[in-house]
Amino acid sequence: MRCPYCGNVETTVVETRESDEGDAVRRRRRCSACDKRFTTYERAELAMPAVVKKNGDRREFDREKLRASMTLALRKRNVSVDLIDAAIARIEDKVFTSGASEMSTSRIGEMVMRELKRLDKVAYVRFASVYREFEDIDAFSKLIQEI
């Protein structure tokens, strides 16, 4: 497993247990190069609904794209990787258990916004400003008033 901090491929498993939700194996790992610890989750591969973009294109659900967008919104915010991973797992679970064969990016985006609102209000506003394509300061003000 590649270290997300330094890119080293030599890591060791420090602890293994079932996730709180019971749908994954949670592993705490330590990098042999930088000595930092990180968490990974091992899950059964499931057939997720196709994601329908605004222009009608269909794509496979991409967990890493979800992680990247949430991580960008949470950049320089004090939110642990474990909390981010748990939020991503909740979103994935909602997408999978919806039973739908397709899901719009707008529906997934709303799920992301709910999770970010729980994790960090600043990240929520950051994500919403891009996701909802804010054009002016009034849109920011309105969203902040809703919080």
Curated annotation (Swiss-Prot):
Entries under InterPro entries matching the protein: ATP-cone_dom, NrdR-like_N, RNR_NrdR-like
Start and end residues, zinc fingers (unnamed): 3-34
NCBIfam families noted in UniProt: transcriptional regulator NrdR
Keyword Nucleotide-binding: yes
Residues of the ATP-cone domain: 49-139
Cofactor note: Binds 1 zinc ion.
Entry superkingdom: Bacteria
Biological processes per GO annotation: negative regulation of DNA-templated transcription
PANTHER family membership: TRANSCRIPTIONAL REPRESSOR NRDR
The organism of origin for this protein: Leptothrix cholodnii (strain ATCC 51168 / LMG 8142 / SP-6) (Leptothrix discophora (strain SP-6))
GO molecular function: ATP binding; DNA binding; zinc ion binding
HAMAP family: NrdR
Keyword Transcription regulation among UniProt keywords: yes
Protein name: Transcriptional repressor NrdR
Family designation: Belongs to the NrdR family.
Keywords assigned: ATP-binding, DNA-binding, Metal-binding, Nucleotide-binding, Repressor, Transcription, Transcription regulation, Zinc, Zinc-finger
Record gene name: nrdR
Cofactor annotation: Zn(2+)
Record function comment: Negatively regulates transcription of bacterial ribonucleotide reductase nrd genes and operons by binding to NrdR-boxes.
